[in-house]
Amino acid sequence: MSTEIKTQVVVLGAGPAGYSAAFRCADLGLETVIVERYNTLGGVCLNVGCIPSKALLHVAKVIEEAKALAEHGIVFGEPKTDIDKIRTWKEKVINQLTGGLAGMAKGRKVKVVNGLGKFTGANTLEVEGENGKTVINFDNAIIAAGSRPIQLSFIPHEDPRIWDSTDALELKEVPERLLVMGGGIIGLEMGTVYHALGSQIDVVEMFDQVIPAADKDIVKVFTKRISKKFNLMLETKVTAVEAKEDGIYVTMEGKKAPAEPQRYDAVLVAIGRVPNGKNLDAGKAGVEVDDRGFIRVDKQLRTNVPHIFAIGDIVGQPMLAHKGVHEGHVAAEVIAGKKHYFDPKVIPSIAYTEPEVAWVGLTEKEAKEKGISYETATFPWAASGRAIASDCADGMTKLIFDKESHRVIGGAIVGTNGGELLGEIGLAIEMGCDAEDIALTIHAHPTLHESVGLAAEVFEGSITDLPNPKAKKK
């Protein structure tokens, strides 16, 4: 059976970027259709990414906090985990949110077509679904087809004990020994979950630090904590993976490589993601896709074909949901005739580990590469009353300032709920605030977020909660 639809806008993909674009189009009065290959809206982020991982990380945090309270006189019994119930709760979280999206799509009169969509021309798209083909004739298209985990040719990915992030989030079992390939955000978050549930975690990372994009001083604080839980093998890489009946045997080389192949019950491959640009027949619409699968766009998110836009992971790094959402808004507004551009000063990044590692704006490495003369100011949480009282005094807040203008150009936080504290720094950079603006803003006490104001005071030389190196000498 084949049906045909005519619409002003078709959005290919219903992740955060896609559904945000579609809903914004509808709000601006445009007739809109979403094409989504899966049965629910929300994409990777909501179904097999950001949201389920946070649900499981919440479970992990509660388990770890319960253990830590023994040092303060509150002793719980050894936690008993029911994997089936944890999985059910995770699915409940997902279903609540996907159900909400379905309701909003219906309320906005956005039509959803389920199936795999591919271009057949500059203004046509064909969707292959369970109930047959749907041909969509469109005036404008927004490509939001996302990305998928990288696979390596020497790894037997067909073996069910070789996981990607989606497999890890299914929580089918808790392996006794789990190897995480890749010391990035996804791998470390999943390692955090499975360690709390009882797995022995090894992490192999080819660079000299985990979370390579973040500054070394911030990562150092994080590494000190997780080294007590994980076996970190830095400056090391996997060279061979062999699936045997009794386990997955992994050979490594490098600074921390074991001399012999190691046996694991499961291996999580978390070495990055690749865009889905080559899976759409975009060339039939005249859209240029590069060798890696990315689609190049201008600041209005237009591709080389003016009425076809692209947003989210498929247009390049950083592959983050919040970036895609803003791109979706801009694309929708441009289609509606507004002269809008996607030109953010900053895009925040967060590893939702324990402790969390969060940064926004320029890192020190990036400032050096750009030739910017800068100065940093750091406030250690060991001097924070709230951090000490909350047993998280190993955290740190760092601000990076332009040396001449004193404007904040970057910042990072490592510590409990660091990601929740990052917003002020992002807003300060976006609004062009200098150190004095932040230092003179009265922050509530005792809080963790006052560490941002105190770091600015360190730079200004007005700090009284620490020894002041800028104080006048007597």
Placement of each model-derived feature along the sequence:
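Flexible, glycine-rich terminal cap/loop adjacent to redox cofactors
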Residues: 10-21, 26-38, 44, 51, ...
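Glycine-rich flavin
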Residues: 2-7, 17, 23-31, 36-174, ...
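Short hydrophobic core segments
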Residues: 10-12, 117, 136-146, 180-181, ...
